[in-house]
């Protein structure tokens, strides 16, 4: 049975740069996403954000405010059958900051994750970024006085 997967993602800036996780897709092409991931039962979105960022990057963050929501729906029947838990994702995007004085721990990268990189906002605008709806919209999302619904995208490929 298909599942709607909630995830918490961080827009994490440090010294003017944004942290992104780098990945390779099934074809070997690079793409980037915000650190963060799936919410566990009985876990708040903020708790999920802190846990997932620490797992993927080894960094300890503090959520500052909820910025945006984006949905990703995979329509490919093969994808839906093999990975029902990833076929409809609702990404809750938070502005976050590093917690000062906490040393970085060993990261436990996700499947297909090749590392983490700090990039300028301009560099991020030129990268294949997930969620797709955030491409070219980071400044507008940060400038908004209230959370932004970035919409839903339907994707036909098998991504895992």
Model-predicted segments: where are they?
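Conserved beta-strand segments that form the floor/walls of ligand-binding pockets within enzyme
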Residues: 19, 33, 93-95
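Residue-level detector of family-conserved "landmark" positions at structurally sensitive sites
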Residues: 63-64, 134
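Unchanged
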Residues: 39-62, 73-130
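Conserved N-terminal beta-strand and adjoining loop/helix that marks the start
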Residues: 1-19, 40-41
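Nudix hydrolase/Nudix homology domain
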Residues: 27, 32, 104-160
């Amino acid at each position: 049975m298909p599942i709607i997967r909630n995830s918490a993602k961080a827009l994490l800036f440090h010294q003017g740069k944004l942290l992104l996780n780098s990945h390779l897709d099934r074809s070997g092409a690079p793409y980037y996403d915000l650190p963060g991931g799936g919410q566990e039962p009985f876990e708040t979105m903020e708790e999920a954000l802190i846990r997932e960022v620490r797992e993927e990057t080894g960094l300890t963050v503090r959520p500052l405010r909820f910025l945006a929501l984006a949905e990703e729906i995979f329509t490919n029947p093969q994808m839906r059958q093999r990975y029902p838990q990833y076929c409809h994702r609702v990404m809750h995007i938070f502005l976050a900051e590093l917690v000062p004085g906490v040393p970085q721990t060993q990261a436990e990268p996700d499947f297909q994750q090749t590392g983490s990189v700090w990039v300028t906002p301009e560099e991020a605008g030129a990268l294949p970024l997930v969620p797709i709806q955030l491409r070219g919209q980071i400044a507008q999302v940060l400038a908004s006085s209230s959370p932004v619904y970035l919409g839903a995208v339907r994707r036909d490929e098998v991504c895992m």
